């Protein structure tokens, strides 16, 4: 697989039910790691690992390239707060980018930020990535990830 590619996404908060989070990563060798921790109603952490085909990795790269996220900067994005935090780290080719921001509830939050255009790119990319990961995990393990 492509050794010039890595992706990690995390969203979570510490609240009434402890540390609740969703995290996934794609490693250069095609390994997908997924973790979903919710203590609501005493749920247990879901951890799954699977290897994806190189065509999935290529599609992932295409999604990232098409989003143009590598042109963005999180300097004006809302910082993590009591509501939660999101982190996105991507290594693609010779670029290594990392973003940190607060949880985004809706496009209203995006539009009211100091950098609505950049945050919108992040918001839609994250939606696409989560959709892809939930589909891969759901199809591979026949579970409902959320």
Curated annotation (Swiss-Prot):
GO cellular component term, pick one: nuclear speck
Classification via InterPro entries: Mago_nashi (IPR004023), Mago_nashi_sf (IPR036605)
Claim: Transport is one of the keywords in the record: yes
BP GO annotations: mRNA processing; mRNA transport; RNA splicing
Pfam families to which the protein is assigned, alphabetical: Mago_nashi (PF02792)
Alphabetic keyword roster: Cytoplasm, mRNA processing, mRNA splicing, mRNA transport, Nucleus, RNA-binding, Transport
Compartments reported by the entry: Nucleus; Nucleus speckle; Cytoplasm
Molecular function per GO: RNA binding
KW ATP-binding (keyword) present: no
Function, in words: Required for pre-mRNA splicing as component of the spliceosome. Core component of the exon junction complex (EJC) and also involved in the nonsense-mediated decay (NMD) pathway. The EJC is a dynamic structure consisting of core proteins and several peripheral nuclear and cytoplasmic associated factors that join the complex only transiently either during EJC assembly or during subsequent mRNA metabolism.
Family: Belongs to the mago nashi family.
Record's subunit section: Core component of the mRNA splicing-dependent exon junction complex (EJC); the core complex contains CASC3, EIF4A3, MAGOH, and RBM8A.
Protein name per its UniProtKB record: Protein mago nashi homolog
Gene: MAGOH
